[in-house]
Amino acid sequence: SEMCIRDSYYAYAMKCKNKFVSSWFGFNLIINNVLVAFTARKYKMDIASLIVGDTEICEALRTSGARDFGLSGEVECLEQLVKISETEELVEREKKIDQLRWNWMEEMTFFDYFTGERLFVFLLQLEMIERWIILDKEKGSQLFRSIIAELKDEVQIPAEFR
């Protein structure tokens, strides 16, 4: 089934030997599941059947009746996710989700300068920017200019390659 494929996708990705990649997929699993759980609760849907994955957090989302699903100490960004889940306007909601992801990537690669992880983050950020250029040309262009400026600050290109 579709749910089984999603479970397998995340399980496989979270076993990646690259710590950043496995953390990235774990982080996205948390974001997606928590937002699904809040939305399902709001519309009185069966939460358990909508949660993807087999982690302790997934189990808490499936079984807890607590307002925060008992995850306040477990999920660092829970309060942000609560606020995002309360955002009715969909484009604004998407922007907040991407901002959360963007901040997480920046935090996780703060000390990585020109590593594979930093390149992966750069590609993920370009993907986000591409989406936002389509949705909001001004904001997307701004993001693109800021990431290029940041790259110029980060990377020292040898004179012979300039």
Each predicted region: which residue ranges?
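Extended alpha-helical surfaces
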Residues: 1-2, 6-162
